[in-house]
Design a protein with these regions (language model features):
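Glycine-rich phosphate/adenylate-binding loop
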Residues: 1-152
Length: 152
């Protein structure tokens, strides 16, 4: 959908229902400089909300920042949008297929968080990895840890 709020809602529904069905989040970052996938399944590793900080001092900052510059935005009539090249969705689809094919071949989706950038992108290198749960994550963490994070 391109809306982080929708991804967070899907994440919350997955956690609330305790489903074993995996959810694959795919996103284009910035103006298409890179694409990322995040495979969410079970509760042993981090959820989609664990991709941003949960503590009071760094609340909602990215745990794995990739963009060095703010994306350029455009306005057309009453709508705002982030322009990117036609190749960006193709890169996102290719990375999505890489994850799914790997899962079908091996039964595993590791690493669950993956990033691919264009060759000339001005981005930070982010390693492919399995994201650890944040103890204070408001979606999958413990209530005690969340309260402690707010107090510090």
């Amino acid at each position: 959908t391109g809306e982080e709020a929708v991804s967070e809602m899907i994440n919350a529904m997955r956690l609330d229902r305790g489903t074993k069905v995996p959810v694959l989040h795919v996103r284009i970052r910035g103006n298409g400089e890179c694409v990322q996938t995040f495979w969410a399944q079970g509760r042993e590793l981090g959820c989609f909300r664990c991709l941003v900080q949960a503590d009071h001092k760094n609340y909602r900052e990215e745990r794995y920042p990739v963009l060095k510059d703010q994306p350029k935005r455009r306005q057309l009539g009453c709508a705002g949008f982030t322009p990117y090249a036609v190749s960006a969705p193709m890169s996102a689809a290719a990375l999505c297929l890489e994850v799914v094919v790997g899962w079908l071949e091996t039964g595993r989706a590791s690493p669950r968080f993956r990033t691919r950038s264009t060759s000339n992108a001005n981005v930070y290198a982010v390693k492919d990895q399995d994201v650890k749960r944040l103890p204070a994550c408001p979606a999958c963490g413990s209530t005690d840890a969340a309260l402690a994070a707010v107090r510090t």
